[in-house]
């Protein structure tokens, strides 16, 4: 079984865990490609997610790699992938908004599930390369548990094939999804207010139905983003749109 794993450095803390899982599996022919400084490769692979896994040279997989997925590959099976389309809650989540920086990035990394100090350290180092003190906002409840968050990078920094200039910021991820509560709107709005001090436009990639990693297209439209058209389509998984908003 051959696996070609494309990833955007440690923009997503799960990338650290996935690279470790893959490296520990000796039964797979593995090739890894960091697209952080390779926009031409990201464009060639039509990549708009933090990771892209190609199995046996032809099967694309977008969602995170797990130990269970590795076991399936070792058994000679390619698991079928389904888009992540949970119900989006509409009741505003209540909590405290906190700026995300290198000093508290480990808390934000909990959006990916199980905590991993090493992955948080890798993400903090990755973010520091961009010279920003704040990378977004997270919403915490009264017990300081993570409810949701929104993060960005300067558009000039991202390898994806999206509009890039000094006036444009790019939303890299917007989380978490709950069936009752809306945990994403508050941190996204806080981030937009902060970005308006430096940028005039913000862009994001949204799927028509799936919520990973930025919320679906309906969520973006509700927040005033305009549809700039389809940038990529996989009939088995996603139809991605570039969305933009003047701020």
Please place each PLM-identified region on the residue numbering.
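Conserved beta-strand in the GNAT
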Residues: 138, 144-158, 170, 175
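Conserved GNAT acetyl-CoA-binding A-motif
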Residues: 195-211
């Amino acid at each position: 079984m051959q696996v070609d794993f494309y990833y955007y450095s440690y923009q997503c803390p799960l990338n650290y865990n996935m690279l470790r899982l893959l490296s520990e599996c000796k039964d797979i022919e593995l090739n890894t490609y960091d697209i952080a400084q390779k926009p031409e490769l990201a464009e060639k692979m039509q990549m708009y997610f933090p990771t892209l896994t190609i199995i046996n040279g032809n099967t694309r997989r977008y969602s995170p790699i797990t130990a269970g997925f590795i076991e399936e590959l070792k058994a000679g099976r390619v698991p079928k992938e389904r888009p992540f389309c949970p119900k989006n809650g509409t009741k505003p989540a209540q909590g405290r908004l906190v700026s995300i920086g290198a000093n508290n990035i480990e808390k934000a990394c909990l959006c990916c599930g199980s905590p991993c100090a090493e992955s948080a350290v890798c993400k903090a180092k990755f973010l520091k390369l961009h010279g920003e003190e704040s990378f977004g906002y997270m919403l915490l409840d009264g017990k300081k548990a993570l409810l949701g968050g929104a993060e960005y990078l300067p558009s000039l920094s991202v390898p994806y094939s999206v509009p890039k200039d000094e006036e444009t910021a790019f939303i890299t991820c917007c989380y978490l999804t709950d069936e009752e509560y809306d945990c994403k709107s508050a941190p996204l709005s806080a981030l937009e207010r902060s970005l308006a001090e430096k940028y005039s436009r913000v862009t994001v990639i949204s799927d028509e139905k799936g919520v990973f990693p930025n919320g679906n297209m309906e969520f973006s439209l509700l927040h005033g983003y305009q549809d700039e058209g389809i940038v990529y389509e996989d009939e088995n998984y996603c139809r991605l749109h570039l969305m933009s908003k003047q701020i």
